[in-house]
């Protein structure tokens, strides 16, 4: 009897061990990824710089200040990298060489629809709300027929495909037009990227960097513009402004930057199965951060003479490097809580809140700026243009920030808006399946 009890005990322990080993993989599957609040703050700093850069010429004529804050064409590449980074982080598995299948169900088209519907509702609402502002300028210069065509291009997010019309209506939103194409590509690219091991990812990273460098080099070579500073350059003085537009606005070339971000994310996400040397100085976020700042400041002070295109091809891998290091520093358990780190600063709640309202800032700063600074619009509304009042610039910044905070609370967090957006998204997904 005692022997039977011992056998049962051994069997029970084996059964429990087997059960625990069976459930262990399930825990890994359902385990959520660590949150990366620093990414929100990084988004705010990028958007803040871009928003100020778009209108700084309306507030100052100081050459140094203009050069320091007009490198928007350089910094916007980092915005695409961050978008690709987040997309890969949310749609692939941690410490596994596979994508997250449910993110691409029921079809790959559904992934694109869901990503686009994440930003289209506010974009659409802004188009409607500020349409009178957009039409004042468009109808004045182009007439009603072309304005109607331009409305179709902007509402369909097709404007980035037209080099001379990429900045129609709400100029900064050409970014969303290009990003939309990237989200068409990603559901087909991410599953393959997720399968790659570190060496494969590193090779792909280098190839993407070389490809984007080739594009920028070809442009600079053909226009003899290696030393151009396009951010402050009048279009009439450029040998081929259309060529420049076709490079900086191209959805195809922007997708390369998005893929660089996706590959960067995967390089960090497999750290648990392919170890890296965390003690290396190259893993410190401060190194790429200083190099990025040095690039911007060096060009501002004319210490470094290079075109926006070449600078962007350098800035993009530096930002990818910085983002990977911030990610590793955020999830690392080695630094003590008392130690200073850039990731802890970027995770500060006021900064993450600004990160939360950064998308409304990006959408709203353009049309609000047009009201005060676009000559044909401001003269129609106020009888003068606010470029004559440089002291108004901080007020404009305040108006944008307050408006973004209100929109975040009233529109983005609105349950009815969220429900309507979800219903539209589901309907479009169902339509894509039926086809």
What are these regions (language model features)?
Residues 1-233, 254, 281-286, 344-345, ...:
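Membrane-cytosol interface segments of multi-pass membrane proteins
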Residues 88-96, 135-136, 188-197, 262-273, ...:
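Structural signal for the C-terminal ends of transmembrane alpha-helices
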Residues 228-232, 237, 241-251, 260:
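Membrane-interfacial catalytic/cofactor-binding modules of polytopic membrane enzymes
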Residues 235, 241, 268-272, 282:
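Membrane-interfacial loop- and helix-cap regions that link adjacent transmembrane helices
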Residues 250-258, 262-264, 283-416:
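Alpha-helical transmembrane segments of multi-pass integral membrane proteins
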Residues 276-279:
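Secreted, luminal/periplasmic, and some membrane-associated catalytic domains
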């Amino acid at each position: 009897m005692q022997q039977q009890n011992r056998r049962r005990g051994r069997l029970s322990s084996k059964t429990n061990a087997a059960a625990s080993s069976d459930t262990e993989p399930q825990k890994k599957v359902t385990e959520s990824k660590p949150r990366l609040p620093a990414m929100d703050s990084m988004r705010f700093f990028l958007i803040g710089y871009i928003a100020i850069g778009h209108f700084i010429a309306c507030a100052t004529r100081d050459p140094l200040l203009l050069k320091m804050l007009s490198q928007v064409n350089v910094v916007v590449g980092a915005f695409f990298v961050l978008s690709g980074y987040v997309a890969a982080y949310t749609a692939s598995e941690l410490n596994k060489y596979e994508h997250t299948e449910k993110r691409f169900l029921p079809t790959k088209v559904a992934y694109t629809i869901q990503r686009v519907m994440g930003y289209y509702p506010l974009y659409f609402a802004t188009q409607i709300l500020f349409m009178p502002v957009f039409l004042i300028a468009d109808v004045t210069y182009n007439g009603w027929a072309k304005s109607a065509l331009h409305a179709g291009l902007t509402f369909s997010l097709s404007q980035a495909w037209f080099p001379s019309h990429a900045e129609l209506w709400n100029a900064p939103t050409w970014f969303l037009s290009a990003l939309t194409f990237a989200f068409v590509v990603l559901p087909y690219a991410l599953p393959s990227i997720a399968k790659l091991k570190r060496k494969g990812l590193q090779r792909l990273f280098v190839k993407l960097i070389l490809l984007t460098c080739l594009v920028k080099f070809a442009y600079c070579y053909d226009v003899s513009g290696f030393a151009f500073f396009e951010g402050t350059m009048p279009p009439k003085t450029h040998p081929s402004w259309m060529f420049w537009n076709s490079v900086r606005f191209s959805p195809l070339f922007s997708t390369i930057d998005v893929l660089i971000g996706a590959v960067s994310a995967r390089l960090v996400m497999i750290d648990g199965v392919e170890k890296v040397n965390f003690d290396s100085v190259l893993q410190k976020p401060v190194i790429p951060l200083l190099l990025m700042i040095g690039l911007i400041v060096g060009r501002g002070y004319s210490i470094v003479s290079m075109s926006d295109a070449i600078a962007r091809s350098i800035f993009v891998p530096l930002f990818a490097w910085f983002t990977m290091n911030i990610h590793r520093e955020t999830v690392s358990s080695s630094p003590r809580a008392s130690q200073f780190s850039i990731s802890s600063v970027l995770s500060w709640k006021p900064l993450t809140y600004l990160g939360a309202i950064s998308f409304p800032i990006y959408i709203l700063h353009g049309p609000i700026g047009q009201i005060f600074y676009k000559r044909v619009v401001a003269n129609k509304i106020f009888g003068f243009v606010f470029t004559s009042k440089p002291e108004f610039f901080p007020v404009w910044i305040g108006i944008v920030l307050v408006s973004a905070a209100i929109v975040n609370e009233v529109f983005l967090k609105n349950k009815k808006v969220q429900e309507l957006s979800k219903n539209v998204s589901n309907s479009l997904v169902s339509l894509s399946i039926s086809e």
